[in-house]
Amino acid sequence: VVSDYVAVDRLVDPFQVAADYTEAGIRSLKAGLDVEYPRPKGFSYRMKEAVEDGRLSMADIDQAVERVLTQKVKLGLFEDPYPHLDRLKALLHQKSTDELNEKMALESFILLKNERKTLPLSKKTKKIAVIGPHADVLRSYFGTFSYPAALDMTMAREEDGQGFDEPGLIVYDIEQKYPGQLRDCSPRLERRLQAEFAKCRTLYQALKEYLPDAEITYAKGINAVGSDLSGMEEALNTAAEADVVLFTIGGKNGWGITSTVGEGVDSTNIDLPGRQEEFARAVYALHKKTVVLHFDGRPLSNAFIASHFDAILEVWQPGMMGGQALCKVLFGDYNPAGRLPVTAARSVGQIPVYYAL
C-alpha cells in the first residue's frame, strides 16, 4: 500500500489530524501504509525514535517491510533488478496497442451539438482549414499523468525555471504562482514527442494522410493561454479561404503553472482561457461551415460558442492515435457517443454541482 504524493504530510497541514510528522507517520503505518511518497517525511528517522520510546512496535514496521519485499520477490527484482529497455520499447508500438489506443479515443469522443447536418463531413471536401491552439500540437493529446505532460513540466523548469525562485534547484514544496502568461508548448518538446511517439499524429497531420487529395491548410492563430493575438489574422485568412473550418479550442492539461488545468492547478473560472472567445467570435463572423473541437481535461462552458456554432465535438485528450480517430469521426467512419460522463455547469454560479441536480 503506497500513499498519494505528500498525503502523509497533509495529515499535519492542512487536515490537522496529526500534531506533527512523527504522529502522521505512526498513524499511517498503523493504518496499513507501507510506502510513503514522494519522499520520507513521516516514514523517516522519526520511526526509529517512535520504536525506541514505545509509540510504535517493530511488528508494525516488519509488516510493511515484509509486504514490500514480498512484492519484489514476486516480480523477480532480486534476481533481475534492472529493466530491459529493448523489451520495454518493443511493447510500446505494437499493432494491438495502437488499435486499442484508437478504440479508446473513438469511444471517448462526445458529440455535443450537430445542427444543419454539419457532421459528418464529406470526404470530397476540397479545402479544409485546421486552426486554433490544438490544431497541430501533439502535447494536446495527452493528459496530466502522462509522460508528455511530465516532460513538458521538466522542460519548463529546465529552460526558464518557471515556478522556482532559483532555476535549477530541486524544490519539492513549491508555492504555486499563476503568471499572466502561462507557458505554451515549446518546439523542442514537440520534436521530442514526435520522435518518441512516431505514430502519433496531430489533427492537421492526420488529415493530410486521411484525405491525400484535399488541400489541408493550418494556422494556429493564438495560444491556448495568454493575450497574444499576433497570429489571429493569419488564421482568419486561412479559414476564410476554406470550404470547411476545423476550429480547435480549450485549455492545457498538465502540471502546475505550465497548464490551465491538472495537478496543482485550481481555477475560479469554467470559461475558455486566454482570448479564445475573442478568436471564436472572429471565426464565427466568417460564416464558414465550422466544427468546434474542444481539447481539455475538464468540461468548459462558453455561451457564445454553445449558441452560435452548429457542430461541437468534445475531444478531451485522445491519446497517441487520437488524430487518426478524429478523422474517422469527422468523416463518418465512426459514430460518436452523445453522453457526457460528467455534469457540465452552464455557468460558474451553478458550482458546486451535485449529483442530485
Please annotate each region the language model reported:
Residues 5, 11-12, 18, 43-58, ...:
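C-terminal non-catalytic regions of proteins with extracellular/luminal or membrane-system context
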Residues 1, 20, 53, 84-85, ...:
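General structural signal for secondary-structure boundaries
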Residues 44-45, 66, 70-89:
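Conserved, charged catalytic cores of large soluble enzymes
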Residues 36-37, 59, 76-80, 116, ...:
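Residue-level signal for secondary-structure boundary elements
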Residues 21-33, 66-77:
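Conserved short secondary-structure transition element at the edge of the structured enzyme core
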Residues 1-14, 18-19, 27, 33-40:
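Short acidic/histidine-rich active-site segments
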Residues 59, 79-107:
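Helix-enriched interaction subdomains in cytosolic or periplasmic regions
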